[in-house]
């Protein structure tokens, strides 16, 4: 009888140890999964979070900064089922490229600069490093979504003040000062604005 009781106690202890091991394992795995989800979510929506924030801060027409960012760097997102701005976008020599990480985008810009390429658009708002040489302290900072979007917001607000307080004219000038290109951009902008407005 005593042997049987001791055997049951050992079995119970074994089960408790196994259960504790499983619980610890789950606790270790769960944060990694949460972090992975957070990273995917952040990369997909980080530009939009920033544009919405700075639209309010600088009193920019609602949805306009978000729309410009989407038109400039829009990438189809399967999770949100819509085109969203991608923070790790580089445009140079007439070619736009979406990189999976910030580090990859930074490396590409440095490679282009080393090769003598001057006109490079970067980040959520596609800030041109040649036209705005003092916008950022470094290439790394240029890809900081908040800093990139805030600079774009200030630039757009300045254009607004110099374009008869007309947001459409300001947005067209944001893209290009060449009338033909600006008009073509306007068509894209108006269409995208309605889509962004409905999505939000």
Task: Go through each PLM region and give its residues.
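N-terminal secretory signal peptides that target proteins for export/translocation
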Residues: 1-15
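A generic signature of intrinsically disordered, low-complexity regions enriched in glycine/proline
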Residues: 12-15, 22, 76, 95
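Catalytic glycan-binding domains that act on GlcNAc-containing polysaccharides
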Residues: 36-200
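Bacterial N-terminal signal peptides
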Residues: 20-29
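Hydrophobic alpha-helical segments, especially transmembrane helices
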Residues: 16-18, 187
């Amino acid at each position: 009888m005593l042997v049987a009781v001791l055997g049951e106690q050992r079995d119970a202890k074994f089960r408790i140890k196994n259960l504790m091991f499983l619980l610890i394992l789950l606790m270790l795995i769960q944060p990694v999964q949460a972090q992975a989800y957070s990273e995917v979510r952040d990369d997909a929506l980080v530009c939009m979070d920033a544009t919405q924030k700075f639209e309010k801060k600088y009193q920019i027409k609602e949805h306009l900064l978000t729309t410009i960012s989407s038109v400039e760097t829009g990438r189809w997102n399967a999770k949100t089922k819509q085109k969203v701005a991608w923070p790790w976008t580089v445009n140079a020599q007439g070619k736009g490229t979406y990189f999976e990480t910030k580090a990859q985008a930074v490396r590409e810009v440095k490679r282009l600069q080393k090769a003598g390429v001057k006109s490079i658009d970067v980040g959520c708002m596609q800030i041109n490093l040649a036209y705005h040489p003092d916008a950022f302290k470094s290439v790394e900072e240029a890809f900081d979504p908040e800093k990139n979007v805030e600079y774009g917001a200030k630039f757009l607000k300045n254009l607004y003040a110099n374009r008869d307080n007309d947001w459409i004219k300001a947005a067209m000038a944001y893209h290009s000062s060449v009338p033909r290109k600006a008009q073509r951009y306007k068509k894209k902008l108006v269409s995208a604005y309605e889509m962004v407005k409905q999505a939000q």
